[in-house]
Design a protein with these regions (language model features):
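Conserved N-terminal catalytic/coupling substructures associated with nucleotide/phosphate chemistry
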Residues: 1-180
Length: 180
């Protein structure tokens, strides 16, 4: 097992220890409807900013009630919307562009797909022209929650871009490579 897989297994275990889904964490089993994923990216990205988190996550293969790993049949590399790969299709609907990642992790109890979603920076993340937010564990339209929208804009002002984490879980050699 490589260090990236070990990191994500540890991350999955830490996230599963949280008592409930949060405004920056969503569990799914096999529901990978592209439209919903796009809306969740917007909601989780915006909520991560309000919650002062660098990233938000969707975990496929984890039961949202028990937090037990049950495995998923979702394979993001094979998933499509029409004839288009799901990653490309999702990226085209997000504004600003969001550098989300799908990571497939094989655990002892089954496959888990982790979607890492960066927190919104400088402007709310929208999907197909609509900005979403999490209210508890529910996805809602941001415009319907003016107090959340105000908090989101205040969050952009509180942490300058230069103080944000550029990348996580990167080896020293990778940092050197990226700087060259």
């Amino acid at each position: 097992m490589n260090s990236e897989q070990e990191y994500y297994i540890s991350l999955i275990d830490r996230l599963r220890q949280l008592p409930v889904e949060t405004e920056w964490l969503e569990y799914k089993m096999n529901n990978y409807e592209p439209e919903l994923i796009g809306e969740y990216i917007s909601a989780l990205s915006n909520s991560a900013t309000i919650c002062n988190k660098e990233k938000a996550y969707i975990l496929w293969g984890v039961n949202d009630k028990t937090h037990e790993i049950e495995g998923t049949s979702f394979s993001p590399k094979k998933a499509k919307k029409g004839n288009e790969e799901i990653e490309n299709w999702l990226a085209g609907g997000l504004k600003p562009r969001v550098d989300f990642r799908f990571i497939e992790v094989n655990t002892e109890k089954g496959k888990v797909v982790v979607m890492e979603i960066p927190a919104a920076v400088n402007t709310p993340t929208s999907f197909k022209g609509t900005e979403f937010i999490r209210v508890g564990s529910y996805k809602k339209k941001l415009k319907e929650y003016q107090e959340k929208e105000r908090k989101l804009w205040l969050s952009f002002e509180q942490k300058p871009f230069e103080l944000r984490v550029a990348m996580e879980n990167v080896t020293a050699s990778k940092v050197t490579e990226l700087l060259d």
